[in-house]
UniProtKB/Swiss-Prot annotation:
Family (UniProt): Belongs to the dienelactone hydrolase family.
Hydrolase in keyword set: yes
Enzyme Commission number(s): 3.1.1.45
Organism field: Escherichia coli (strain K12)
Protein name per the record: Putative carboxymethylenebutenolidase
InterPro entries, sorted: AB_hydrolase_fold (IPR029058), Dienelactn_hydro (IPR002925), Dienelactone_hydrolase-like (IPR051049)
Transmembrane regions listed in the UniProt entry: none
Active site: 147, 204, 236
Amino acid sequence: MATTQQSGFAPAASPLASTIVQTPDDAIVAGFTSIPSQGDNMPAYHARPKQSDGPLPVVIVVQEIFGVHEHIRDICRRLALEGYLAIAPELYFREGDPNDFADIPTLLSGLVAKVPDSQVLADLDHVASWASRNGGDVHRLMITGFCWGGRITWLYAAHNPQLKAAVAWYGKLTGDKSLNSPKQPVDIATDLNAPILGLYGGQDNSIPQESVETMRQALRAANAKAEIIVYPDAGHAFNADYRPSYHAASAEDGWQRMLEWFKQYGGKKSL
């Protein structure tokens, strides 16, 4: 059996499940690139359809705590098959490598907690700029993120006024603040620039339903264009097909809802 690193997954993500989805890449172009950002060159993975008739709608894909490992790369490939230019930047690259951490608690304390939200949001702006220079339609800019990236997706929806749509998968909504994370999504409910869909698991021990309801109340009070779907039988990381937490029915429904959300709000094609 291949180890997590041999198979393209972060070591802290083990044990791997037998439900891993691998998207065929014969109809897409995919690979690694480097994106100039804040004086550095940020590694990123991107995928796009081989055939297109002009600039492509753009989806920024924000990683889980495990970085841009094989699951996130496959998410990009799936989006490319749907006609998007999908880009997943390595948002921890200045602070360290997720592959150097063997377990989740050490990864969180030794790497993830060291990454400032402000740095991440600025990096994502540079990803959008790179996309506009590399076949992407900046007027159809969208974002989705998972776990750690789900929280970042909420924050980015309040950060970039050019964003057209956002979908956050089981991202933290409330909780403690720090110098690197001065705000939680509940704090920016009044500042959202784009319609946002949240996808959550009813059995998620890390994001209690009280937290979800608090966010819903904040969104209603702000009259925000937002919706939160809770899948009663799903836990955290229910879309992570490489983990035991995978809940296929919820993941498949969430994926279709995401595509519909992007189609509804993603903006019109540039002339």
